[in-house]
């Protein structure tokens, strides 16, 4: 699973930061979280193929998070896509997509299924064989949802034990791995628990959207085993009043939620244009947070400031900057 930051700015794009968008590559698919203006152009500089996008998650309907959708969908259509796309979002997302599809004399010949979320509680919105996704209502000036993508891990097969019990290479091994019992030629029944090892830890990413800090959100992430939190940090902590007035988060807010969530890594994004030529404020504050809080001074807990086109590999816990 790999995260690619297509846009890490806030309301106004800058020479260093595009409008909000994050792509996650997993098992041949691309999951797109928000689609600010210019998102499809940012993809040109990455290994994301728009044709591999099957699910788009829109946190809320502010322009800096959705104004890239029209161009992206039209370009996908121009390239001959026929596979359907799912779009998830808050109330009014259906009307928004309908209006988008009226723009530009498009050639869209694929089905777009819009899933309008209207829940005040966390809800599972996708449950497939390989992954699941959740929506979590957060606290912003308009309806807004965070999203969580979690890998499903199957138990590992203890091949040596299976061979010792007389299971032959072939369909029986797959059946056991899928959780089914099998009957051998000699009549002996082998149960999954006889040959399966516990699954390895699964990878899980949360994307906060725009929000004030919510401790319950952190606790929910902890309960499902989230490993990486992408959290908005529009302001440095000296601008706490600005954050409260605009219903956003500060650096310290985001880091605190990450610690409550017990994630390995917090990645800060949605950074105000006021810091475009003074991003050192973020690095200095992170250094002070770690220095002054023993619980953050942990080699297993990382705080990263996102940059446009930066990549983060969850398996190797590696950051790649371009």
From Swiss-Prot:
Residues holding Zn(2+) 2: 64-65, 210, 270
Catalyzed chemical reaction(s): Endonucleolytic cleavage of RNA, removing extra 3' nucleotides from tRNA precursor, generating 3' termini of tRNAs. A 3'-hydroxy group is left at the tRNA terminus and a 5'-phosphoryl group is left at the trailer molecule
Pfam family of the protein (one): Lactamase_B
SMART domains: Lactamase_B
Gene3D superfamilies: Ribonuclease Z/Hydroxyacylglutathione hydrolase-like
Binding site for Zn(2+) 1: 60, 62, 140, 210
EC number(s) stated in the UniProt entry for this protein: 3.1.26.11
Disulfide bonds: none
Domain of life where this protein originates: Archaea
InterPro entries linked to this entry: Metallo-B-lactamas, RibonucZ/Hydroxyglut_hydro, RNase_Z/BN
Annotated keywords: Endonuclease, Hydrolase, Metal-binding, Nuclease, tRNA processing, Zinc
GO molecular function: 3'-tRNA processing endoribonuclease activity; zinc ion binding
Record's function text: Zinc phosphodiesterase, which displays some tRNA 3'-processing endonuclease activity. Probably involved in tRNA maturation, by removing a 3'-trailer from precursor tRNA.
Family membership noted in the UniProt record: Belongs to the RNase Z family.
Subunit organization: Homodimer.
Stated name of the protein: Ribonuclease Z
Organism whose genome encodes this protein: Methanococcus aeolicus (strain ATCC BAA-1280 / DSM 17508 / OCM 812 / Nankai-3)
């Amino acid at each position: 699973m790999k995260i690619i930051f297509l846009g890490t700015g806030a309301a106004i794009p800058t020479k260093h930061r595009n409008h909000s968008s994050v792509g996650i590559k997993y098992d041949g698919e691309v999951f797109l979280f928000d689609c600010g203006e210019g998102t499809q152009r940012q993809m040109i500089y990455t290994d994301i193929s728009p044709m591999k996008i099957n699910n788009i998650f829109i946190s809320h309907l502010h322009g800096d998070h959705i104004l890239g959708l029209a161009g992206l969908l039209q370009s996908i259509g121009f390239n001959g896509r026929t596979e359907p796309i799912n779009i998830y979002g808050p109330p009014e997302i259906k009307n928004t997509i309908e209006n988008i599809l009226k723009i530009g004399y498009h050639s869209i010949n694929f089905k777009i299924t819009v899933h309008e979320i209207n829940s005040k509680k966390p809800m599972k919105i996708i449950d497939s064989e390989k992954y699941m996704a959740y929506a979590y209502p957060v606290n912003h000036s308009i309806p807004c949802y965070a999203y969580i993508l979690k890998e499903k891990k199957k138990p590992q097969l203890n091949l040596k034990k299976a061979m010792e019990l007389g299971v032959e290479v072939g369909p029986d091994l797959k059946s056991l791995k899928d959780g089914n019992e099998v009957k051998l030629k000699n009549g002996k029944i082998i149960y999954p628990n006889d040959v399966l090892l516990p699954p390895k830890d699964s990878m899980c990413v949360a994307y906060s959207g725009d929000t004030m800090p919510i401790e319950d959100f952190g606790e929910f992430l902890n309960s499902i085993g989230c490993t990486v939190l992408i959290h908005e940090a529009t302001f440095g902590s000296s601008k706490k009043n600005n954050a409260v007035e605009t219903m956003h988060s500060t650096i310290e807010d985001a880091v605190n939620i990450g610690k409550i969530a017990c994630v390995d890594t917090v990645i800060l994004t949605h950074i105000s244009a006021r810091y475009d030529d003074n991003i050192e404020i973020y690095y200095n504050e992170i250094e002070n947070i770690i220095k002054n809080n023993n619980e953050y001074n942990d080699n297993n807990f990382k705080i990263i400031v996102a940059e446009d086109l930066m990549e983060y590999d969850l398996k190797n816990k590696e950051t790649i900057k371009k």
